[in-house]
Structures are given as C-alpha cells and as structure tokens.
Swiss-Prot record:
Its cofactor is Mg(2+); Mn(2+). This is D-alanine--D-alanine ligase. It comes from Paenarthrobacter aurescens (strain TC1). Pfam families: Dala_Dala_lig_C, Dala_Dala_lig_N. One of its GO terms (molecular function) is metal ion binding. Binds 2 magnesium or manganese ions per subunit. Belongs to the D-alanine--D-alanine ligase family. It is an enzyme of class 6 (ligase). Residues 157-368 form the ATP-grasp domain.
Length: 378
C-alpha cells in the first residue's frame, strides 16, 4: 500500500476537485464544490479546482468559492475557455496538462487523488469513474458499477430486491415502450393506483419529477420527465415519513459506518414533495431533524438496512440511503445516492455532523479512503 502521497513541491497530497459537468445538475455540482473547497484543510491538501463546462470541456477553474455558491440572482456555471485541461500520464505520474491554440502545453504537476463532485449523467453514473480507472487514478467515491447502478432507479431497485430489501410498487418505462404503445404504459401505471411519482430513471436532485394525482396529468408528467431522460420510473405513492441515513465506507475490511438517521420535513405550501427548490433554493422550505424521532429499534434497523444497500450496489467512499417509514413501522427503501450533495443545505454532511463527524473531518476521511484503496479490480 502506498503511504506517501505528498508531492515534492508542497509536501501535501494534490487533490483535483472536479465539478460542473454536462448534466442538468451542473449548478448543484458547482455549489457542492464550493462547499467542499471552502471546508477542505488547505494546510493538509493542495487543491486544484477543475470545472467541466456544459459542452464537456475541462477548464482550470477559480478557487474562489463565492463564484460557485448559490444565489438568488443566478445559478453558477462553468464557462468554456480557450485553455483546456487534460489528465495524462507523464513519466509514470498522472499530470494535469493545460493546452491552448498556438501555445506550448503547460504541465500543472501531478495529481494524487480526484474528488469528482459531479451529479447526474456523465459524472455520477460511472462514466467519469471509468475514465479515472482507465488512467489508474485514485478518486473519491463509488466505482464504475456502483455508480451506474446508483444512477439508474430501475436497476437500483432490481439490486435492492435481490438483496432482500423492501421496494415500493413501480413500473419502468423505456423510450420504445412509450413511443410504440403509450396506452399499454398508461394501463400499467393505472394498476399502481394514484397518486404516482413520475421520475427520469437517470437524474437526481429531483430534476424532472412530478407528482400525479390522476390519469389526466400523466402524459404531461411523462413529457416533463422525458426532457431529462427517455427512460422513466413511475412509482406508486407511499404514505410514510422520509428517513435518510448517511453511509461512510469502513477502513480496510471494516463494515460500512452509518450516521444517525435524519428526517426531512418539507414546509407546507407549493412543495408537494422534496423537490429541487426545497433542496437548494428556498430557505426554510425543508428542514432536517437528526436523529429522527423514531423508536430505538427502528433507528437501528434504518442503519442496518442502509449498510445492506451500500454493500448491495458495491458502493465505496460515501452514499446516502433514503427510506419511507410507514405508519405500520415498515421501512421501504427509496434510493441510494452514491455522490450526495455537499451544499450548505445538503443532508449527508448534516447527518454526519449530528453524529459527531464534522464537515472538514468528513472530507478528510473521504480523501484518506481514496488515497489508501487499491486501483484497478478490487
């Protein structure tokens, strides 16, 4: 195991913070990066911010967190640049190279670990993870398979069911099914009963999600979800409290660590569920209660099942696992998020803080886990 990850120039491991990306969650990724860059111990790590524009271009970004923070005026966005950043192997080391037209490429030095703070497709779904695996670069978080499964709400449920976890009623709808026989899809949804939640299969931050109370609203909700992904998951509404649990990979062969469960309380008003605005935009629209007001045995069960879900998809580093806690005391798993947000309003760091692990220490532990794990098959 490699133990010395410091660079000869600074004596500190170099951490490339990767954010932005091509998905509809671009702005959320920028806000997450602002949170991490503001809290990371710069006496311990040398931070290199790399933004990915919506075009897919990698650029050397500003380390000024105010440029990436959420404001009421505008959502943050990585702008394209004439200078492109690439990750290449030079002399046996992973080097960041800056290229621009009619100029000699500039070497920025080696990278010890990448922190991919990307949400949604082309970042959280195994694509970036595959690129980093191919380049034999260490990185924070889940690998290719776990990231892909954790991004696809359909196959995620298939894996959960195979692990013995309770999953609510749902139907998966492909582009071909909706395009060739929409009426058959409507009949399948009708059997679920209303209300239902129509969701893009591969999107996060509640992008494109609609609550539908009757058949009359189904087609419009499907059209909205298909703007984000042509594959959909339509779930039966479940009466229950929304309970979340943060999971952190154990060191070495230790079991996953779990936080105290938290409960999401959404303010009554325009929000029928925990949507994008409640998560990121509107102050006071949602609040976390941690630990959740539950019997001790239910709390223990949430933590146990969260660890089962983490292992079921083969997650590494971190994940947030969401459940419904029904009036009958049943725990129904909703989803796993293999790269949960780190914004000031994000639940993952809040739950760990309530469990005794501060934000900066959490970031430090995630980087430690990435630096000390093997590359390649593991």
């Amino acid at each position: 195991m490699v133990t010395d990850h410091s660079t000869p120039v600074t004596g500190r491991p170099r951490v490339a913070i990767l954010f932005g990306g091509r998905s509809s969650e671009h702005a959320v990724s920028c806000v997450t990066a602002a949170g991490v860059m503001g809290a990371i111990d710069k006496n311990k790590y040398e931070v290199i911010p790399i933004g990915i524009a919506k075009s897919g271009q990698w650029v050397l970004a500003s380390g000024d967190t105010s440029e990436w923070s959420l404001s009421s005026a505008a959502l943050p966005e990585v702008a394209p640049s004439g200078r492109t950043v690439t990750l290449a192997e030079v002399g046996g080391e992973h080097q960041l190279i800056v290229t621009e037209p009619n100029a000699v490429p500039q070497e920025l030095g080696s990278v010890d670990v990448v922190f991919p703070l990307l949400h949604g497709p082309w970042g959280e779904d195994g694509t970036i993870q595959g690129l980093l695996e191919l380049s034999d670069t260490r990185y924070v978080g889940a690998g290719v398979l776990a990231s892909a499964v954790g991004m696809d709400k359909h196959f995620m449920k298939v894996v959960f069911e195979s692990a013995g976890l309770s999953v609510g009623p749902y139907v998966a709808v492909t582009d071909r099914e909706w395009s060739t026989d929409a009426e058959a899809v409507r009949k399948r949804v009708d059997k679920l009963g209303f209300p239902v939640f129509v969701k893009p299969a591969r999107a996060g931050s509640s992008m494109g999600i609609s609550k539908v109370d009757s058949m009359e609203g189904l087609d419009a909700a499907i059209d909205e979800a298909r703007r984000h992904d042509l594959k959909l998951v339509i779930e039966a509404g479940i009466v229950g409290r929304e309970i979340e649990c943060a999971v952190l990979q154990g060191r070495g062969t230790d079991a996953p660590r779990t936080s105290m469960p938290g409960e999401i309380a959404v303010a009554v008003g325009e929000h029928q569920f925990y949507d994008f605005a409640a998560k990121y935009v509107e102050d006071g629209a949602a609040a976390l209660s941690c630990p959740a007001d539950m019997p001790d045995e239910a709390i223990a069960r949430v933590r146990e099942l969260a660890a089962v879900a983490f292992d079921a998809v083969g997650a590494e580093g971190l994940s947030r696992v969401d459940f419904f806690y029904t009036p009958a005391g049943e725990l129904i798993i909703n989803e796993i998020n293999t790269m949960p947000g780190f914004t000031p309003k994000s639940m993952y760091p809040q739950m760990w803080a309530a469990s005794g692990l501060a934000y900066g220490d959490l970031i430090d532990e995630l980087i430690h886990l990435a630096l000390t794990r093997k590359t390649g098959l593991r």
